[in-house]
Amino acid sequence: MDARLEPYRTLVSFLGEALGPDYEVVLHDLTSEEGTIAAIVNNNISGRTEGAPLSNMALRFIHGKVYEKQPYVAGYQGASQAKGRLRSSTMFIKDGSELIGRSEERR
């Protein structure tokens, strides 16, 4: 995992506790080609665990370079096998205009 993401692990834990058990909070690690979950709380919502691959929606955001146009996407519809439809939001963690952990040659 990119060392610049390490402080966000604490933020994931904080948000999970502050928002409560009905909110899953996930930190993605983009250093590998497929990307993985680096930290997750309240994973009873999706059943995902650390090391699991990114969701299809996260991959669409990355491949569509949504992060170049906006800092976050809020209130879109997600889905979970365990919980059905979800209200989801994504914040892009960047260094300048680049996603942290996403190398230039994989863009």
What are these regions (language model features)?
Residues L5-S13:
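Short amphipathic alpha-helical segments
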Residues G16-A74, A79-Q81:
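Structured interaction and signal-relay segments at domain junctions
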Residues L99-I100:
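Glycine-rich acetyl-CoA-binding "A-motif" of GNAT/NAT acetyltransferases
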Residues E105-R106:
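Conserved small/polar residues in nucleotide/adenosyl-binding loops
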